[in-house]
Amino acid sequence: MKHDPISKTDTVGDFIAHYLAEIGVSVMFGVISIHNMPILDAVARQGRIRFVPARGEAGAMNMADAYARVSGGLGVCLTSTGTAAGNAAGAQAEALTAGSRVLHITTQVDLGYADRDRAAIHDVPRQPEMLRGVSKSVHRMWDSNGAIGALTAAVSDALSAPSGPVSLEIPVDVQRAPAVVMAAVHAPVPTRPSAPQSAVEEMARLITQAKRPLIWLGGGARGAVEEATELMRRGVGVVTSTNGRGVVSEEEAANLGAFNMGPDAMELYGSCDLMLVVGSRLRGNETRNNKMPLPRPLLQIDADASQGGRNYPVDVFAHGDAADTLRRVLDLLPETLDTDEALAFDIARLKAQAEGRLRDTLGPYTVVAEAISGAVGAGGNAWVRDVTISNSTYGNRYVRLSDPRQGVHALGGGIGQGVAMGIGAALASHGPKAIALLGDGGTMLGLAEMITAVDEKAPLVYVLMNDQAYGVIENIQDAQYDSRRHYSKVAVPEFGAFCGSIGMPHVKVDRVDAFEAALQAALATEGPRVIEVDMCAIGPFAEAFAGPPAGAAGKKE
C-alpha cells in the first residue's frame, strides 16, 4: 500500500523514507543509531522498505554493494555520523573499486555544530574529507527546502555512468525539521555520456577490416549484454576481466571468459589483429602489470573519460556509455563480419586447454569446483566470492556465469567481505539461493554478520574453505620468504559450535566425495546454511597458489 503524500505534520525523516520508496527502493541496510533514528522511525511507520539491521556498518555497506550488483538497481546503506561512517569506509572502498550503484546515507551532528569540532558525541570535524576518499561524490542536505535536491543529486550521481557509491550527509536536526509539502516525487533519470559519431565510425571501420577481432569486456560493460552478445554473433571473439564475466555467457564457444592472462590467452592475443576494450581499466593484476602484449589496433570505450589510454596506449578512444556506443557501432557493421571462421573454434580450444590446466592444479578440489559450477550453471545462482585461494584459482574463472549479475567478488582484494556480500546478493536474487565462497581467515572479519543471515532468513549457502590459516599468505611466504611463516596461522573458532549458537545449520565435509550431496541438500532447503570444507583433512591443492603473477606478491629473484 502506498504511503499518503507528505503532509504538513511530516518531518524531513518522513520525506526521506517516502522519497526512497517512491523511486523504487525496497530494501535498505544499516545500523540504527541516535543520529539516524528520525529516518528509521519513518521507514518503520511507513512500512514500504525492508530494513536489514546489520551488526556493523562495514557489513551493511557490503550488503548494499552486493545488492546493487545483483539487482542492477540502487543499493542503500544507512549509517550514523562519526565512527559509524568510518566503519563503513573500507567496504565503501570496495564499492568504489567496483563502480557499484550505492547510496550511503550517513548523518551529521546538529547543523550549528557541524565542521566546527564542538559536538558532544559522534562528531568528526572533517567527515566530508574522509567520505571523499571512498565516494564518487559527497553531498550534504542543508535544510528541508533542499531535501529534494540533495536526494535527487545523490541518487542521480550514484546511478549515472560511470556509476559509483555516493555519500549524503544529513544533520540530525535537519532530519527532525518539518518537511516541505510535495504532491509527488519523480525518480531521477541517470545520465550517460554519448560518444562522438566520428569515433563510432572509426571503430566500425577498423572492426570491419579485422580478420580476428577481440572484445575485452570489463565491469563497465555489465549493462551492454545484448550489444556485446550481438557483436560476438557477428564474428568477434570475447575475453573478459573478472568483473566483466557473464556480460556474454561463458557457455558461448567464442568467449574465453576470465582466462585472460595465461599462456592460452597470450597465444590468442598473438593471433588477433584488433582488440576493443569496453568498460575495463585493464588492471595490472589481469595484464601482468600492464606489460602483457595486446592486439593492435587497440580501441577503447569508457564512460569515464579519464580512463582513456590510462594503462595502455590506444588507437581510438570513445568517451561514451558502453551499451549506446556498441549499439551505434553495430548499426554501421554488416550482419556478418568477414572474419576468420576459425576464431571461435580457436577460442573454444584454448579455453578448454586453460580449464584443463587449472583442473590439474586443484587436486582433490576439482570435485568442489565441478559441483559448484554445475549448480551455478543449472540454477543461475548468484556466485559470491571472498578473497581466498579457492576463488583465486577456480572461483574467478572456472565456475561459469551466464549473466553479469550472477558474479560478486571482492574486486579490490580486501578479505572478509564475503559473509555480508552473500546476504546482499541473496536478498536481491528473488530466485535460487546465492552461494558464497569463504575462507576461514577472511570469515573472521565478517563473522558477526552470519547471525544477520539467520535473522533475515537469507536464501544463502556459505561454502567455508577451512585450512586453519591464511593459506595464500603461507604460500607466498613459502615462495618469497624462504618459508618463514610469520603471523599467518591464526586461531579460528570451532565453526560448528559457533553456528549452533546462532541457529545456523552447519555441516562439515571432510571427504570431497561428500561435497556435492551436501551442496545439493543445502540448496534444497530454506534459509542460510554453512558447508564447512575441512581442507586439513582433505589435503592440499596439487599446486600451491602463491598470489597472481603480477602485483604486490612480487617475484623472488
Predicted segment positions?
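Phosphate/pyrophosphate-binding active-site segments
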Residues: M1-K8, N145, V181-A183, R205, ...
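N-terminal alpha/beta PP-like core and its mobile active-site loop of ThDP/TPP-dependent enzymes
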Residues: K2-T336, P459-Y462, E494
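Active-site diphosphate/adenylate-binding microenvironment
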Residues: G13-I23, V31-I34, I39-Q46, I347-V419, ...
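Short, small-residue-rich loop/turn micro-motifs
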Residues: I32, T106, V172, T242, ...
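Thiamine diphosphate
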Residues: Y113-H122, Y269, G309-N311, F317-H319, ...
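A structural motif corresponding to the C-terminal end of an alpha-helix
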Residues: V134, A371-G379, C499-M504
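Generic recognition of flexible, low-complexity loop/linker segments
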Residues: V155, E201-A204, E226-E227, P263-A265, ...
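Basic phosphate/pyrophosphate-binding loop/patch that engages nucleotide-derived ligands
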Residues: S160, G377-A378, V454-P459
